Swiss-Prot record:
Keywords: Endoplasmic reticulum, Glycoprotein, Heme, Iron, Membrane, Metal-binding, Microsome, Monooxygenase, Oxidoreductase, Signal-anchor, Transmembrane, Transmembrane helix. It is a single-pass type II membrane protein. GO terms for biological process: cyanogenic glycoside biosynthetic process. Heme binds at C478. This is Valine N-monooxygenase 1. GO terms for molecular function: heme binding; iron ion binding; isoleucine N-monooxygenase (oxime forming) activity; monooxygenase activity; valine N-monooxygenase (oxime forming) activity.
Length: 542
């Protein structure tokens, strides 16, 4: 049952997280807007009441919206919005609610049963995506796959990805490039030990992911000269920082996404962050793509070496290039943005949790010694036999998701989820945070416990029952779950097999507090790594 305005305001005051310096300006704008169209509001309310009376099922519960603008004042006032939404659902004791932002129905879900209704039973209905500034910027004008509305362009690009780019055969073809970056990870961490430095696990994990994708796409690790110790140079740091900025603001509750007439005013500052981050990513990548296209045109390049070559050489039925340069550039940018975050975030958190529970760290290392031994380095071929290591990663995905919500699924027609009516155009989002921590699904949900995943046969990182979200599922699910699983497992396995990890000197316990406006550790996790294998097994060059 929807709450009245006074109840809602009381709830908001109780769950306030932060205030923006621009609140007063925005409030004035909304008050002026409200006064100027009061007569229209009355008409809309009457129309909505008549329409509501014709429905057989109620809308999901939620806060009473203000006329026309919905709950945008609350969205602005109580930043970060995702924490306000999760607290709202907790206080309402509901696994589904409906929050009105402008004319958009935002429907978060934190129950696996309802999540499966959306992405399995009603997958075809919820296959669309919303149009927002962040999605348009990431996709170069909706030329790619992940954030593109359900249309012919999406069908074309997804078919190319699944058949030519992310296929099992292509994954096998690119194995050696991934292996090079697993070796470079060990080289980099070993050099931190030689220099008597702690390892910044955020730096190590994020740049391992960036290195893997750059090597698979461009056959190179560095945009610049790189660093002698195998770590990122200034160019790679700027590039990866831009990737994570683009991710932070993707569907980030930007005001103009819900009130499009405000686009360009950048009232909450998000528009500049989005545009600048996506420009930085392309400033590094596009010159390499242009150069490679010219090499193929001139005949200088004749053999395929990486994914960029595959994109460029794809032909249509008439023998013409299947993709335009803009499609290639933007799809590669989207691949970079979409593949680095999940593995790096999960393993930074996993290492922090395991450092605070050394018995888990010990058990995972013992599994590696038993399955792989100490006479060679762990390889991708070992992954099927490393169930406990995978359980450690899987538990990090559950407890510490990289994003609060998954990418929105827009209803293409009126439908029913649970016992609630969901109008056409609603944004249904799975709460990654809420699903993974739902006490109705998980016992002791805030405890990091890999053992909870060890009684299900072979451990995998995918979760098709949607008890939590790793790579999602359905026709709009991640097409690169095999790649993501390999990157995640190899990252953790190499770190555990090759080094003994301890907290930094004078630190007895790793701080696992979350950043307020993200789900990353508030302080990047650092630890000291000591080699535990024979010296000849450690790579000696980047």
């Amino acid at each position: 049952m929807a709450m009245n305005v006074s109840t809602t305001i009381g709830l908001l005051n109780a769950t306030s997280f932060a205030s923006s310096s621009s609140i007063n300006t925005v409030k004035i704008l909304f008050v002026t807007l409200f006064i100027s169209i009061v007569s229209t509001i009355v008409k809309l309310q009457k129309s909505a009441a008549n329409k509501e009376g014709s429905k057989k099922l109620p809308l999901p519960p939620g806060p009473t919206p203000w006329p026309l603008i919905g709950n945008i004042p609350e969205m602005i006032r109580y930043r970060p919005t995702f924490r306000w939404i999760h607290q709202l659902m907790k206080d309402m004791n509901t696994d589904i609610c409906l929050i009105r932002f402008g004319r958009t129905n935002f429907v978060p879900i934190s129950c696996p049963v309802l999540a499966r209704e959306i992405l399995k039973k009603n997958d075809a209905i919820f296959s669309n995506r919303p149009k927002t500034l962040s999605a348009k910027s990431m996709s170069g004008g909706y030329l790619t796959t992940i954030v593109v509305p359900y249309n012919d362009q999406w069908k074309k690009m997804r078919k190319i990805l699944t058949s030519e780019i992310i296929s099992p055969a292509r994954h096998k073809w690119l194995h050696d490039k991934r292996a090079e970056e697993a070796d470079n990870l060990v080289f980099y961490i070993h050099n931190q030990f030689k220099a008597n430095k702690n390892v910044n696990l955020r730096t190590a994990t994020r740049h391992y992911g960036g290195n893997v994708i750059r090597k698979m796409v461009f056959s190179k690790r560095y945009f610049g000269k790189g660093m002698p110790d195998g770590g990122p140079g200034p160019e790679e740091i700027e590039h990866i920082d831009a990737v994570f900025t683009a991710l932070k603001y993707l569907y980030g509750f930007c005001i103009s996404d819900f009130l499009p007439f405000l686009l360009g005013l950048d009232l909450d500052g998000q528009e500049k962050f989005v545009l600048d981050a996506n420009k930085t990513i392309r400033d590094y990548q596009n010159p390499l793509i242009d150069e490679r296209i010219q090499q193929w045109k001139s005949g200088e390049r004749k053999e395929m070496e990486d994914l960029l070559d595959v994109f460029i050489t794809l032909k249509d039925s008439d023998g013409n290039p299947l993709l335009t340069p803009d499609e290639i550039k933007n799809q590669i940018a989207e691949i970079m943005i979409a593949t680095v975050d999940n593995p790096s975030n999960a393993i930074e958190w996993a290492m922090g949790e395991m450092l605070n529970q050394p018995e888990i760290l010990k058990k995972a290392t013992e599994e590696l010694d038993r399955v792989v031994g100490k006479d060679r380095l762990v390889q991708e071929s070992d992954i099927p036999n490393l169930d406990y290591v995978k359980a450690c990663a899987r538990e990090a995905f559950r407890l510490h998701p990289v994003a609060h919500f998954n990418v929105p699924h827009v209803a293409m027609e009126d439908t029913v989820i649970g016992d609630y009516f969901i109008p056409k155009g609603s944004w249904a989002v799975l709460s990654r945070y809420g699903l993974g921590r739902n006490p109705k699904t998980w016992s002791d949900p805030l405890k990091y416990d890999p053992e909870r995943h060890m009684n299900e046969g072979e451990v995998v990182l995918t979760e098709h029952e949607l008890r939590f979200v790793t790579f999602s599922t359905g026709r709009r699910g991640c097409v690169a779950s095999l790649l993501g699983s390999c990157m995640t497992t190899m990252l953790l396995a190499r770190m555990l097999q090759c080094f003994t990890w301890t907290p930094p000197a004078n630190v007895s316990k790793i701080d696992l507090a979350e950043t307020l406006d993200e789900l990353t550790p508030a302080t990047p996790i650092s630890a000291f790594a000591k080699p535990r294998l024979a010296p000849h097994l450690y790579p000696t060059s980047p």
